[in-house]
Amino acid sequence: MFISVPLPMLFPDFLKIDISDLTALLGGISLGPMAGITIAFLKNLLQFITGMSTTGGVGEFANFLIGGSFVFTVSYIYSKKRNIQGVIIGLVSGIVVMTVVGCIANYFIILPFYATIGWSIDAVVSMGAAINPAIDSKMSFIIWMIAPFNILKSGLMSLLTLPMYKKTEKILK
């Protein structure tokens, strides 16, 4: 999360748009899905071991798991259909996969991990409720914070990827 942007009026501060995920995405498109996953892993590991983590490694794990699902989906589909149509189908599919994986992972894994480093789930829900009064439980936090955040993040990554792909299309083929 070397180049990350919080959106404080829309989401709690620990949910950040991490533009550096583009590196893993472009690596996956150009070198294949496993390369993309490896880049995502190394990026998050480097973030953690350099002491830049503000979440005790939980945020990096979440970024790898959820962002990695996006990178893998896009790059796998592109590896089967190496043209602009493959990129678009991959990006749209990646948005869906990242949103679903993000919701499931946060409900069962990520939010409970935050509790192990001293953040109660109730405190996390309260952070969301301060922004959106419809949030009153872990499930409503997932529905009203996690799902929209992952749609926004993966949608933004998709919008940034398309012009980069067009500029590098000949090299990638």
Language model features: what each stretch is:
Residues M1-K173:
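Loop-helix junctions at membrane interfaces
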